[in-house]
Amino acid sequence: MSPKTETKASVGFKAGVKDYRLTYYTPEYQTKDTDILAAFRVTPQPGVPPEEAGAAVAAESSTGTWTTVWTDGLTSLDRYKGRCYDIEPVPGEESQFIAYVAYPLDLFEEGSVTNLFTSIVGNVFGFKALRALRLEDLRIPPAYSKTFQGPPHGIQVERDKLNKYGRPLLGCTIKPKLGLSAKNYGRAVYECLRGGLDFTKDDENVNSQPFMRWRDRFVFCAEAIYKAQAETGEIKGHYLNATAGTCEEMMKRAVFARELGVPIVMHDYLTGGFTANTSLAHYCRDNGLLLHIHRAMHAVIDRQRIHGMHFRVLAKALRMSGGDHIHAGTVVGKLEGERDVTLGFVDLLRDDFIEKDRSRGIYFTQDWVSMPGVLPVASGGIHVWHMPALTEIFGDDSVLQFGGGTLGHPWGNAPGAVANRVALEACVQARNEGRDLAREGNEVIREASKWSPELAAACEVWKEIKFEFEAIDVL
């Protein structure tokens, strides 16, 4: 036995298993400005005290393991360990608790969402002592957020590039999402942009399939953009999905988009991965491309109330990793999204400084310092009758995206785009005149439809369409 081993044993090392709370539950701890703070919804197994469950989360997501190890003596555990510093019961829920955990900054690689998530939402989510575990929120300190580039450009730079101010931007996802040839796809893009939309979009699962290879789609969409710009005098864009099976292929597609001179590309950031997304965001900033982000797969992670991760955490991660737009629900459409919760993470995407507000699900005050903001995209089951509510809920700094609500118009794609543009302009004008869109919205749309036959036809088609289901993710 070496002298060092004997010394280790002599100062108190004892093999075996001990309660996590003896080391990782520290209610006396005063959090530091540089700590990353996490709020976990913890559901312990029967018989497991909440303090032990919270301490287990802190341990397993930082320096701990299931047994005492002698190599703990070779480092300063107090410097590097996560600490569960507070636990509170969830009102109205049996055996559920919010455990607050503080992590020292040195645990995480600079500028890496991948490394951050590998620790905080890694193996701990399979821990047997917990029936369920959900990460509700993270506080990212400026000392860490400043190690990230963030969005390639941000809201103000995008508006300057597009020369569009004072209203939400309008988009449309091309449908059917799969099966069109590249030429017919480009035709649909042209018709929608000519009709008055600012953007059209690849659906998230349009990559490079046998019926439409990516290079052909990019070329026909670029042709559509330039033709629509020449006819309307407005800057137009199409979200060309660069998502691919490898990072190298993804970058090849982004490079080709830049060579075509188009303004924006797209990435599926959860299925593509944070490493790929951050790489693409860096390329987009360096080469003047806007970056639209789709959140495909998010509901697998965030929809269950007691297990997984809330979308507000995914939204913060995206702002750090990089994206100029991200889908954020609609409140009024076909996809999940309760109003106060949605507006909470919309503010986390757009604003520089967001105060703690538990009524909106915001557990921590978040200071983004100078990191650019991200435009929230409202998309999914929306049509012209939703325009007043969307304008009132999301405000000017947003993208309102109507897929079926454009391409489903009885007269075709261009009239569908006209209907949406007329409805939007009417709502913005009414709001600027001081009218209450929440109360008078339907009347605003009816008035505009009297002089726009395209809008009148759209109003007739979708007058009975509603998606009246209760949201699952509520406070």
From Swiss-Prot:
Claim: Metal-binding is one of the keywords in the record: yes
Keyword Protease set for record: no
PTM sites of type N6-carboxylysine: 201
Sequence positions that bind Mg(2+): 201, 203-204
Residues carrying N6,N6,N6-trimethyllysine: 14
Cofactor note: Binds 1 Mg(2+) ion per subunit.
PTM comment: The disulfide bond which can form in the large chain dimeric partners within the hexadecamer appears to be associated with oxidative stress and protein turnover.
Maturation propeptide residues: 1-2
GO cellular component, one term: chloroplast
Protein name as annotated: Ribulose bisphosphate carboxylase large chain
Source species of the chain: Cedrus deodara
Gene designation: rbcL
